[in-house]
Swiss-Prot record:
Protein's recorded name: Protein translocase subunit SecA
Matches recorded under Gene3D superfamilies: Helical scaffold and wing domains of SecA, P-loop containing nucleotide triphosphate hydrolases, SecA, preprotein cross-linking domain
Quaternary structure and partners: Part of the essential Sec protein translocation apparatus which comprises SecA, SecYEG and auxiliary proteins SecDF. Other proteins may also be involved. Monomer and homodimer.
Species the sequence originates in: Thermus thermophilus (strain ATCC 27634 / DSM 579 / HB8)
Gene: secA
Biased composition (Basic and acidic residues): 957-971
Compartments it resides in: Cell inner membrane; Cytoplasm
Its EC number(s): 7.4.2.8
A GO biological-process term: protein targeting
Length: 997
């Protein structure tokens, strides 16, 4: 194991050495030359011309990086460190740069962005929320504009026109969800002017910030665009009432109980519930039905299961909050609200019923994609985060991305203390309060990380209300009494009398009795515990001011995080991933100065205002004063910013002397990465700091995944909450539990990807063909329409014209009725004459007649109008069929695992069934399009002709598992070949005829 770790780190060190030689040294050599350039944009244009003439990006990297570094120096007052140049090169190579908090990932991205923007194909910088997208675009904008590059930013409220403009910019800052939804919406567009992504190279190069959060934590969350489904919602209220009446039982367990008890059992690990036979009978009685799981009642059974899941597995202020009468999901990884996101399969409606709020109509999926498959569509992708190395295997296996750990600019000196483990959650929280009180009294800033809104508010309440701590004092007192019961004498009697009123105890009351207590042993331990409890209560009574940062209090997020490093500051926050603001010791003078100027009416994000603030904070007052005059900033504001700077500087020295920011984790997360993200908030850029996690065996991680043997051992040994549990077995149990969950979640994500890959291949085929119809030339649209008519007519005819059956026995009346249902224009066709032909010839004759009827229909409407009708019809039919197909796949997937009981591989079965469903959908699309094109009535003001879009090459999708619209993109025409589809053969024949004419 050690050898493997050594090899991993050796590989990383070799990579870093390579970057120093190939990137850092050449860029540094160019620095003096670039500093003298009067026009950086002109120099950047020269690089662009070189690239257009054939120079590779790798060849242009040193000069592009040097220009970007100089632009940052001139317009932001920031210079890329050497290690940041390495980070930029890692991103350019399509890898993941692991960079610790405070190492300047935002600035690093500008290097790879500027280099890859030379292609003119657009670069997307992907962030986790709107605030970071806007902040980074405005903050780094001057660097790009200094090089002559345009910058776009997309927000949730951006209009289609604003989105289109932003995506056409050289650099686009956008959140992962907005980007994914724009892709899905583009593939639902019915005219080219509805598209917002670029027509050519819509997904060229993406740099994903917090890449582990997006590609791993959110990998299981599909992006879904949905429309209302036809389903009664009042039933959910009834199911919520029935769920309340059902009682939770215990599952069957070998050697304990043969049968499950109660009405249902719960599997928290898998977030699933199972009705017992008793529960099924009770539910049937309450519903007034028989056979809850019979086909006609399956919908009711599904709704009841979701109601029980909502009751047992989804908790208010942990998984969701209720705000303004709406159930809003809380992101389990970032602690942020996700308005607009809804749980699927009726679960959201079940939660709404449980909470008694208005139930929104259930939705049907119109388009969907997972982040896993969406980001794999990019020609090149890269990522950056503070924590990725632990997940390198997953990044390599699923995304083909290596992780490079970029060295810090200064060594990390943060002290990470061992975990403190308690038997119960109550004991753990008392210990956390004691630690906070101790650090607060010293003046050391504390950041407390919790995993849910509920826990953050509970801890806040304990700090606000000293009475909630009294049980801890009483427990400590009982332990001391027990340890000292054999002690005799007048002094002991005085002490016992004093201890009769514990709530009134003060530190000074206990001080005179210090000499009574021996220096070592149980009595000393109990005495120290009592003293600590008395002192903590005294500090709580004086008050511990603190800030709570969770999804309910997100409005002041940046301000709270920016000032979390000030002395005597206590901040309680839910998961810290993607908070985007550095915690600076002594407070953030730049943020305070920006807030001051904003209050005075200045735009804090305007680059000259930002530059002024940076110069002032850095003490470069002469340069700052020149900018102040230009911006109209008054002298008294300069004086106030100077005071802010000095206050923060003095406080920083005070905090450094106290040991820096101290991190308290109140629970181990399922993933070590999330724990490391919290730890990483302290010790930025070589600052001092410390961290410690408090764990209890009531925590979800330990309760669900820790070894039963360890818990049984603790029960036998009679551990209580007076002292933490220190045992190597416990420490190993925590590590194993996290590893077990990480492995399980990786397996789930791999399985999700395996199943989603089947859908992904089908989606690529449909979307590529759909894009061909939307953006292709008129002749290509006509070719597709004719191909569908041919396939449909031929397929219908072959059902009746069996070559194995004598022509006299063919059901021509049935054939006629079927064909006229699709193409009424064939009314006058001489069907009786078909008996004189062979089956194949008869089919060809019918196809030719249908094509003549189609040509006549085109002449009747005019070619431009016919093309517009074809586009409209094909796109609408495809969208409706695809919507239904997604629903069918969803139903298939829900039940496919039952086939495992029949000794069949569920995935292989899913693949076979999904392919069959896809082929059926394709046949349906062709049939419906043909029917619509023949039968559609066009009124006086019909469909407005769509102006033919400029020809855009669409990457050819492999027609798997079936050729979709009967045609492929036009190529040089070879003579007809055997083995081609009928549509392809006829297309080639038509092109051959045209060529001869």
């Amino acid at each position: 194991m050690l050898g493997l770790l050594r090899r991993l780190f050796d590989n990383n060190e070799r990579e870093i050495a390579r970057y120093y030689k190939q990137v850092v040294e050449p860029v540094n050599r160019l620095e003096a030359e670039v500093e003298k350039l009067p026009d950086l944009a002109a120099a950047y244009r020269e690089l662009k011309e070189k690239h257009e003439k054939g120079a590779s990006l790798d060849e242009l990297l040193p000069m592009a990086f040097a220009l970007t570094r100089e632009s940052a120096k001139r317009y932001l007052g920031m210079r890329h460190f050497d290690v940041q140049l390495i980070g930029g090169a890692v991103l350019h190579e399509g890898k993941i740069a692991e960079m610790k908090t405070g190492e300047g990932k935002t600035l690093v991205a500008t290097l790879a962005v500027a280099l890859n923007a030379l292609t003119g194909k657009g670069v997307h910088v992907v962030t986790v929320n709107d605030y970071l997208a806007r902040r980074d675009a405005e903050w780094m904008g001057p660097v790009y504009r200094g090089l002559g590059l345009s910058v776009g930013v997309i927000q949730h409220a951006s209009t289609p026109a604003e989105r289109r403009k932003a995506y056409l910019a050289d650099v686009t800052y956008v959140t992962n969800s907005e980007l994914g939804f724009d892709y899905l919406r583009d593939n639902m567009a019915i005219s080219p002017d509805q598209l917002v992504l670029r027509h050519d190279h819509p997904l060229h190069y993406a740099i994903i910030d917090e890449v582990d959060s997006i590609l791993i934590d959110e990998a299981r969350t599909p992006l879904i665009i949905s429309g209302p489904a036809e389903k009664a919602t009042d039933l959910y209220y009834k199911m919520a009432e029935i769920a309340k009446k059902l009682e939770r039982g215990l599952p069957a367990e070998p050697g304990v109980r043969k049968e499950p008890t109660g009405d249902y059992t719960v599997e928290e690990k898998n977030r699933s519930v199972h009705l017992t036979l008793q529960g099924i009978a009770k539910a049937e009685k309450l519903l007034g039905i028989e056979g809850l799981f019979s086909p006609e009642n399956m919908e009711l059974a599904h709704m009841l299961i979701q109601a029980i899941r909502a009751k047992e597995l989804y908790h208010r202020d942990r998984d969701y909050i209720v705000q303004d009468g709406q159930v809003i999901i809380v992101d389990e990884f970032t602690g942020r609200l996700m308005p607009g996101r809804r749980y699927g399969e009726g679960l959201h409606q079940a939660i709404e019923a449980k909470e008694g709020v208005r139930i929104e109509r259930e939705n049907q999926t119109l388009a969907t994609i997972t982040y896993q498959n969406f980001f794999r569509l990019y020609e090149k992708r890269a990522g950056m985060t503070g924590t990725a190395k632990t997940e390198e295997k997953e990044f390599q296996e699923i995304y083909g991305m290596d992780v490079v750990v970029v060295p810090t600019n200064r060594p990390v000196i943060r002290k990470d203390f061992p975990d403190v483990v308690y038997r119960t959650e109550k004991g753990k929280f008392y210990a956390v309060v004691e630690e906070i009180a101790e650090k607060y009294e010293r003046g050391q800033p504390v950041l407390v990380g919790t995993i849910s809104i509920e826990k953050s508010e509970r801890l806040s309440q304990m700090l606000k209300e000293p009475r909630l701590y009294l049980p801890r004092l009483e427990m400590r007192l009982e332990l001391f009494k027990k340890a000292s019961q054999k002690q005799q004498g007048p002094e002991w009697e005085r002490l016992r009398k004093l201890l009769e009123r514990p709530a009134q105890l003060k530190d000074e009351d206990l001080a005179p009795f210090e000499g009574l207590i021996p220096p070592k042993g149980n009595l000393r331990t109990a005495w120290e515990g009592l003293k600590r409890a008395v002192h903590t209560l005294a500090v709580l009574r004086q008050g511990i001011p603190h800030q709570v940062l969770n999804a309910k209090h997100h409005a002041r997020e940046a301000e709270i995080v920016a000032q979390a490093g000030r002395s005597k500051t206590v901040t309680i926050a839910t998961n810290m991933a993607g908070r985007g603001t550095d915690i600076k010791l002594g407070g953030n003078p730049e943020y305070l100065a920006a807030a001051l100027l904003e209050k005075e009416g200045f735009d804090r994000y305007e680059w000259k205002v930002e530059l002024f603030i940076k110069k002032m904070v850095a003490g470069k007052e002469e340069e700052a004063r020149a900018l102040a005059q230009e911006l109209g900033i008054r002298e008294e504001l300069l004086e106030r910013i100077r005071e802010i700077r000095e206050e923060c500087k003095q406080d920083e020295e005070r905090v450094r002397a106290l040991g820096g920011l101290f991190i308290i984790g109140t629970e181990r997360h399922e993933s070590r990465r999330i724990d490391n993200q919290l730890r990483g908030r302290a010790g930025r850029q070589g600052d001092p700091g410390g961290s410690r996690f408090y764990v209890s065996f009531d925590d979800d991680l330990m309760r669900l995944f820790a070894s039963d043997r360890v818990i049984a051992m603790l029960d036998r040994m009679g551990f209580d909450d007076s002292e933490p549990i220190e045992h190597p077995m416990v420490t190993r149990s925590i590590e194993r539990a996290q590893k077990r969950v990480e492995d399980r979640n990786f397996a789930i994500r791999k399985q999700l990807l395996q199943f989603d890959d089947v859908l992904s291949r089908q989606r690529e085929v449909i979307y590529a063909q759909r894009r061909l119809i939307l953006l292709g030339k008129d002749e290509e649209v006509k070719e597709a329409a004719i191909g569908m008519v041919e396939e449909t007519v031929a397929s219908l005819a072959e059902n009746f014209l069996n070559p194995e059956v004598h022509p006299e026995d063919w059901d021509l009346e049935g054939l006629k009725a079927t064909l006229l249902d699709t193409a009424p224009q064939l009314q006058d066709f001489p069907f009786a004459e078909l008996r004189a032909l062979k089956a194949e010839e008869a089919v060809e004759r019918l196809v030719e007649a249908a094509l003549k009827a189609y040509e006549a229909r085109e002449a009747e409407l005019s070619p431009p109008l016919m093309r517009a009708v074809e586009r409209f019809v094909i796109l609408n039919v495809v969208d409706n069929a695809w919507k239904e197909h997604l629903h069918n796949l969803d139903v298939l997937r829900q039940g496919i695992f039952l086939r495992g009981y029949g000794q069949k591989d569920p995935f292989q079965e899913y693949k076979i069934e999904a392919t069959r469903l896809f082929n059926e959908m394709v046949a349906f699309i062709k049939s419906e399009v043909a029917k619509f094109l023949f039968r559609l009535k066009v009124e006086a003001e019909p469909v407005r002709p769509v102006r033919e879009a400029p020809y855009v090459p669409v990457p050819e999708a492999k027609p798997e598992p079936s050729e979709v619209f009967g045609v492929e993109r036009k190529r040089a025409t070879p003579p007809p070949q055997p083995g081609l589809s009928r549509a392809e053969r006829r297309r080639l024949m038509r092109q051959e005829k045209k060529r001869k004419k």
